[in-house]
């Protein structure tokens, strides 16, 4: 592993440390809702600033509500807060202007030159007032290299979609840096405790320490300043950022400073060696409350507070004891430590732990853990409702408030998944039968992936006062992806809804192109290529999207064309691999050569298609990482971190290898493609020498290749190349007949 050691001039290093520690408390200016909504229009639709008028209204029961109507030449949008006004703006853009606003800053927004008139006043009230977004992992799989302009667009997107409880964990290392300094730790001990940037989510969840560290001081300072902008903008737009609290995770170096403290190792995680294991301070130790007090005070000084704190003890690790009384004492003590510093504190807890270790987290243990916290002071995220609804298994979380959440993506994998009809049925049932303590909804996606349709559906559902016809909804979605009514686009999305979007997002999904090569199956557990639909239906969708009506094609439409095309080809790759394996079993070298060449051609063609869109570029991921560095040493460190999480994740041969696999131009040709080329060559050599192919020997060889790739410095294009429609049509023509068989 590359060990980055920051060696700035002594004066500069001390100056940065001093700046962080001595910064005055951050004051966050209050922006009036009407002003915030007007500024939203100025950012997204600057040419139409004078055409929108916002007004604030009062509502009964503080329900989030918006109203729309035309008055003269203005579109009047009313709401009880800036968030509701933003949802009203989005409703107008979606259903009157046929506009789909993407969460990516590179996607332009196309609005008609003449704004459509609202012929009849529109009023909508949210079915729930709590709408959560993000996952600790998203900050590693999607967001680690984001700068302010990326965040600004995403926060605007969240406001448009009514999200008002975003997870906000950027920059917390600056808080911890100051806190651990107060407890006697050195700069080297603190920065060495942190992981590399892309791995910080798992450090924050107390899964691993040190991995790919130490963390540069420039990163800590830069992320602190970024977080101040993030939470300020989120609050402007009517959101309550969810900040972290202390859950017991401490640096091992603290043992020497406090030898009598009750500190335990949390045990193995992800196959990492013992030296990377996290340490847990017993909540009953007097030191726990002292650390909590210092942390919350310092965090509030730097970032303010909305009194909602995300704290997740025992995430994917085993507690020191499974006794219900112990678990109850832990949760009670953690909550009390928060409340002692902030009497208004509410604890947001993800219920993933109850799903992940469901054999251990029995109902008596869950009930003890939850009921030890005062009623309504703990909010549960029912984390993975697209798979398992924990509220149904726990008597509605034994009365504590919870949010129904759609996960949908792991590792930012690029697999076409998500079933709108199942989501509709489950959400509607939760609204009707989930109890009064079902406070709202959310999305807990690990990475953005390639299925924005389901995410936007989930948040729009929060504003529907009853069942939704998914056929009609998907048709409206199709219209705004195209920018206008279009027969082919609407038919394509209708097929997707009825015949393709069948399976939920699951752990470790990918086209076979991304998998560790093998003659059967799909390599490792985290690269499952199984699909529950006929690829010929997806081929038909691809063909329809390749032939839209004339006129400007929005960026989101071109994204869809690339997305559907690369998945269709990825599915077909499995067919050709199986032909190659069959030829191997028959010792048919001619057929092996033919199918091996076609396998490599599919990978190259997928790479060429992906290269036409900025959302599918390895070069952009790496360039964004390098841009975080202030000198060449830092740039190389950040690039290494960015490569590592996509490849081995952990050490050479790690069980997490390819967990964050994704279809990206550059990854296909240079990483997955070269691995498949090695495989094809080795299998062919085995037949030529009349030997059986040795999968174990190849896996060992593959381990070395994967690790070496993460240490390289190749340059990849960071800007798209080629026209998406032209490349897509050419590839459809090339492969359609074969796939259709």
Language model: regions and residue ranges:
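Active-site-adjacent substrate/metal-binding segments within catalytic domains
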Residues: 128-147, 158
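Contiguous, structured surface segment used for ligand recognition
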Residues: 28-128
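Catalytic-core regions of glycoside hydrolase
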Residues: 49, 100, 106-115, 134-138, ...
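Histidine-centered catalytic/metal-binding microenvironments
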Residues: 524-741
């Amino acid at each position: 592993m590359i060990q980055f050691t920051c060696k700035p001039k002594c004066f500069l290093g001390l100056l940065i440390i001093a700046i962080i520690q001595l910064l005055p408390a951050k004051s966050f200016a209050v922006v009036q809702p009407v002003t915030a909504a007007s500024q939203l229009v100025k950012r997204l639709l600057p040419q139409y600033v004078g055409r929108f008028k916002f007004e604030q209204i009062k509502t009964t029961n503080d329900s989030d509500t918006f109203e729309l109507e035309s008055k003269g030449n203005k579109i009047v949008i009313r709401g009880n807060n800036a968030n509701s006004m933003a949802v009203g703006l989005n409703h107008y853009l979606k259903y009157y202007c046929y506009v789909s606003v993407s969460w990516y800053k590179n996607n332009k927004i196309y609005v008609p030159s003449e704004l459509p008139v609202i012929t009849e006043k529109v009023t909508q009230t949210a079915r729930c007032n709590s709408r959560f977004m993000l996952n600790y992992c998203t900050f590693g799989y999607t967001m680690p290299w984001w700068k302010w302009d990326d965040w600004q667009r995403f926060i605007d997107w969240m406001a448009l979609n009514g999200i008002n409880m975003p997870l906000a964990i950027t920059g917390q290392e600056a808080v911890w840096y100051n806190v651990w300094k107060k407890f006697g730790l050195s700069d080297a001990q603190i920065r060495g405790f942190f992981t590399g940037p892309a791995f910080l989510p798992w450090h924050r969840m107390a899964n691993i320490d040190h991995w790919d560290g130490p963390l540069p001081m420039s990163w800590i300072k830069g992320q602190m300043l970024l977080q101040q902008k993030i939470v300020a903008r989120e609050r402007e737009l009517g959101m309550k950022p969810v900040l972290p609290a202390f859950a017991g995770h401490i640096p091992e170096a603290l043992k020497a400073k406090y030898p009598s403290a009750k500190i335990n190792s949390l045990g193995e995680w992800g196959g990492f060696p013992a030296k990377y294991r996290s340490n847990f301070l017993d909540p009953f130790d007097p030191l726990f409350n002292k650390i909590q007090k210092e942390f919350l005070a310092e965090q509030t000084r730097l970032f303010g507070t909305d009194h909602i704190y995300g704290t997740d003890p025992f995430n994917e690790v085993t507690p020191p004891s499974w006794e219900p009384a112990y678990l109850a004492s832990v949760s009670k003590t953690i909550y009390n430590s928060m409340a002692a510093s902030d009497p208004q504190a509410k604890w947001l807890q993800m219920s993933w732990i109850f799903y992940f270790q469901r054999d251990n987290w029995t109902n008596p243990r869950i009930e003890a853990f939850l009921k030890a916290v005062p009623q309504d002071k703990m909010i549960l995220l029912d984390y993975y409702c697209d798979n398992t609804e924990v509220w149904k298994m726990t008597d509605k979380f034994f009365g504590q408030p919870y949010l129904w959440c759609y996960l949908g993506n792991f590792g930012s994998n690029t697999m076409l998944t998500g079933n709108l009809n199942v989501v509709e049925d489950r959400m509607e049932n939760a609204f009707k039968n989930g109890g009064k303590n079902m406070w709202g909804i959310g999305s807990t996606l690990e990475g953005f992936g390639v299925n924005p349709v389901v995410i936007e559906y989930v948040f729009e559902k929060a504003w529907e006062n009853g069942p939704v016809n998914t056929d009609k909804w998907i048709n409206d979605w199709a219209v705004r992806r195209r920018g206008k009514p279009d027969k082919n686009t609407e038919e394509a999305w209708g097929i997707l809804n009825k015949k393709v979007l069948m399976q939920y997002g699951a752990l470790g999904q990918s086209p076979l192109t991304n998998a560790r090569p093998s003659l059967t199956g799909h390599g490792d557990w985290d690269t499952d290529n199984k699909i529950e639909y006929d690829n010929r239906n997806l081929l038909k969708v691809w063909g329809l999207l390749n032939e839209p009506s004339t006129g400007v094609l929005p960026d989101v439409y071109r994204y869809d064309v690339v997305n559907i095309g690369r998945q269709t080809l990825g599915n077909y790759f499995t067919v050709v691999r199986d032909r190659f394996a069959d030829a191997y079993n028959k010792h048919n070298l001619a057929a092996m050569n033919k199918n091996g060449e076609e396998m490599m051609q599919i990978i190259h063609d997928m790479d060429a298609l992906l290269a036409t869109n900025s959302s599918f570029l390895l070069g952009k991921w790496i360039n964004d990482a390098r841009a975080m560095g202030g000198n060449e040493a830092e740039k190389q460190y950040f690039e290494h971190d960015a490569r590592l999480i996509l490849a081995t994740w952990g050490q050479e041969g790690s069980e997490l290898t390819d967990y964050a696999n994704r279809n990206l131009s550059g990854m296909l040709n240079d990483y997955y493609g070269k691995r498949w080329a090695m495989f094809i060559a080795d299998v062919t050599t085995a037949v030529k020498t009349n030997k059986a192919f040795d999968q174990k020997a190849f896996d060992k060889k593959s381990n070395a290749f994967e690790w070496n790739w993460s240490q390289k410095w190749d340059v990849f294009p960071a800007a798209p190349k080629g026209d998406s429609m032209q490349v897509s049509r050419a590839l459809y023509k090339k492969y359609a007949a074969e796939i259709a068989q």
